């Protein structure tokens, strides 16, 4: 048995971030559960929950949310055999690298491992830029358990037998092991080890990925996404195979979380939960048959094809209150270029039905793809107006940033548009959520034009939406003050005033 320390690093966010998304770390919690089931002792250091009200300004104009790096290192047991660090979002890599350097300084002989979407996308870069020894590619549960078993028995020299790794061998050379297949049976994966971290810090504040609707815990109903959008890095992490869990097994987990943690709301972190219409119908019928009572949300974005009148009615009847669509663009030309398979007429019809059946609906758009022109943005503006007319409650307009592991990132690298993956580049990645900063990777539109287009699109949507439904801004203000949140705009307003009162903004 080995002692394994798993760390979720502090989170970086722009000072003028659109909203505070303080979420329990479901990915590391899954890995911790698998390692514990394999017989190892796990020390879980979640830097967010251990200092959930701590925000540290950085020279880059960002805030670091969570425990300071020296305090994290102080919590690592002296007799730990392996330290694992989660590295998901590329814009947080500078903090992750700083943490890894501090760990290596304190533990010069301890094996350092990282997993997550960022290091999976650029494993050689991550090894070259940090003191990491091993990178776990893709899904980490089985790979991490195998790594610890083999390392305990034979040291780093035996890691070549573990599929799904990139590592430095004893001579310092980078080695790739065999590709590990996706986990076949999602129902057999042990549930997240929430007992290893102070989950109550999130629950008591209603923190989660979605709107604050009480004591929220994240769950996953599926893994992977069958689509290949060129701006997305998920195919590198998950491949393009969508695999759902058994609805009954998922409902068993939800029932257990209600009983153990008095959870009242569940945020589904799936990349694309609603792909198969029959699956979501079976899930909703299962809630009804068991007479379960809870709210749930789909904050990541979902497909419109399967959400018709029947499905949207079932969603609301079984407690779903918030869903998000992610068409990204209203331009057919842009949609084809980014390989976004979405029908705008079907999307708008689905939006109308969702609103009619009581759901709170948000839509996500992205401006500034490399080939975008004003013509494409005007086409998107028309869809934004039609979405407001359909009655949806919120939109978010992001500016495109090229994430490592995505097709567009590789294209821009080959064209010389991304010359160095330095800290300035990673800082530009964080600007996607900053309401004051924009960086352009678009050939035809500059930074100021995209910033203006983003602001104009936001005002256009809310101007039309509130003109048609003039009571909504008053509800947003009242709910933001009271803390009884129903929409993402209320979450954003409340988060902004929270930062303002603390003197961040």
Describe each model-derived feature in a short phrase.
Residues 8, 46-51, 236, 365-367, ...:
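Residue-level recognition of beta-strand->loop/alpha-helix junctions
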Residues 187, 192-362, 369, 374, ...:
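Radical SAM [4Fe-4S] cluster-binding motif and immediate context
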Residues 2-5, 10-19, 61, 162, ...:
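N-terminal [4Fe-4S]-dependent radical SAM core
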Residues 22-35:
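Short catalytic helix/loop segments, enriched in acidic residues and glycine
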Residues 125-143, 314-322, 379-397:
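Structural recognition of alpha->loop->beta junctions
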Residues 4-6, 37, 41, 78-79, ...:
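Radical SAM enzyme core and accessory elements
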Residues 13, 51-53, 123, 227, ...:
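Flexible glycine/acidic-rich beta-alpha junction loops that bind and position SAM and/or redox cofactors
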Residues 3, 34-185, 405:
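Glycine-rich beta-alpha loop elements in corrinoid/cobalamin-binding modules
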């Amino acid at each position: 048995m080995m002692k394994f320390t798993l760390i979720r690093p502090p989170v970086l966010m722009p000072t003028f971030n659109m909203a505070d998304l303080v979420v329990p770390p479901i990915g590391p919690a899954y890995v911790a559960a698998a390692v514990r089931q394999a017989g190892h002792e796990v020390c879980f250091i979640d830097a967010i929950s251990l200092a959930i009200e701590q925000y540290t300004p950085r020279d880059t104009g960002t805030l670091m949310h969570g425990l300071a790096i020296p305090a994290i290192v102080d919590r690592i047991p002296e007799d730990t055999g392996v330290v694992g660090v989660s590295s998901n979002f590329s814009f947080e890599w500078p903090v992750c690298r700083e943490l890894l350097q501090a760990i290596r300084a304190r533990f010069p002989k301890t094996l350092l491992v990282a997993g997550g979407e960022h290091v999976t996308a650029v494993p050689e870069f991550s090894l070259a830029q940090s003191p990491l020894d091993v990178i776990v590619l893709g899904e980490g549960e089985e790979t991490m358990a195998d790594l610890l078993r083999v390392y305990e028995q034979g040291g780093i020299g035996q890691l070549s037998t573990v599929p799904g790794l990139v590592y430095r061998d004893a001579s310092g050379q980078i080695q790739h092991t065999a590709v590990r297949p996706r986990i076949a049976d999602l129902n057999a994966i042990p549930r997240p080890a929430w007992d290893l971290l102070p989950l109550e810090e999130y629950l008591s504040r209603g923190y989660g990925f979605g709107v604050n609707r009480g004591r929220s815990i994240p769950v996953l109903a599926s893994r992977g996404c069958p689509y290949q959008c060129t701006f997305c890095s998920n195919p590198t992490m998950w491949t393009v195979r969508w695999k759902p869990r058994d609805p009954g097994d998922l409902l068993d987990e939800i029932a257990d979380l209600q009983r153990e943690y008095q959870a009242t709301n569940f945020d589904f972190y799936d990349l694309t939960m609603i792909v198969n219409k029959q699956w979501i119908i079976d899930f909703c019928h299962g809630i009804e048959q068991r007479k379960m009572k809870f709210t749930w949300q789909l904050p990541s974005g979902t497909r419109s094809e399967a959400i018709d009148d029947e499905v949207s009615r079932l969603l609301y009847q079984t407690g779903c209150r918030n869903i998000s669509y992610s068409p990204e663009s209203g331009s057919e030309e842009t949609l084809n270029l980014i390989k976004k398979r979405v029908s705008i007429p079907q999307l708008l019809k689905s939006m109308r039905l969702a609103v009619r059946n009581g759901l709170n609906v948000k839509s996500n758009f992205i401006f500034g793809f490399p080939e975008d022109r004003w013509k494409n943005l005007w086409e998107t503006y028309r869809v934004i107006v039609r979405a407001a007319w359909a009655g949806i409650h919120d939109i978010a307009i992001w500016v495109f940033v090229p994430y490592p592991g995505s097709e567009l990132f590789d294209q821009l690298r080959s064209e010389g548009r991304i010359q160095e993956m330095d800290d300035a580049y990673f800082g530009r990645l964080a600007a996607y959520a900053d309401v004051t900063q924009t960086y352009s990777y678009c050939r035809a539109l500059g930074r100021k034009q995209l910033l203006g287009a983003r602001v104009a699109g936001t005002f256009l949507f809310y101007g039309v939406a509130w003109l048609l439904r003039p009571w909504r801004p008053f509800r947003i203000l009242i709910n933001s003050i009271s803390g009884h949140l129903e929409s993402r705009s209320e979450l954003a307003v409340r988060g902004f005033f929270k930062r303002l009162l603390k003197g961040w903004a």
